[in-house]
Amino acid sequence: ITIVDCSDYPKPVCSLEYMPLCGSDSKTYSNKCDFCNAVVDSNGTLNLSHFGKC
């Protein structure tokens, strides 16, 4: 299982850095910040499927 540490999130603003991650919802998130904010919003139900686009 691939783990991303989201303990520093949520953050109000994410950078425009593009390092895609694929969530367990089959959605591609543009970077760790976008992904971690979504994880927080999902109350922990969202996980990382893999690094890169879905």
UniProtKB/Swiss-Prot annotation:
Give the superkingdom in one word: Eukaryota
Task: Give me the glycosylation sites of this protein.
Answer: 43
What SMART domains does this protein map onto? KAZAL
What Pfam families has UniProt attached to this entry?
Answer: Kazal_1
**Which keywords does the record carry?**
Disulfide bond, Glycoprotein, Protease inhibitor, Repeat, Secreted, Serine protease inhibitor
What is the protein's name according to its record? Ovomucoid
Q: Please give one Gene Ontology molecular function term for this protein.
A: serine-type endopeptidase inhibitor activity
Per UniProt, residues of the Kazal-like domain are: 4-54
Q: Which residue positions hold the site described Reactive bond 3?
A: 16-17
Instruction: Write out the domain note.
Output: Avian ovomucoid consists of three homologous, tandem Kazal family inhibitory domains.
The cross-references to SUPFAM superfamilies, in alphabetical order and at most eight, read: Kazal-type serine protease inhibitors
Cysteine pairs bridged by disulfides in the record: 6-36, 14-33, 22-54
Name the major location.
Answer: secreted
Any one cellular component term from GO for this entry? extracellular region
| Compartments where located | Secreted
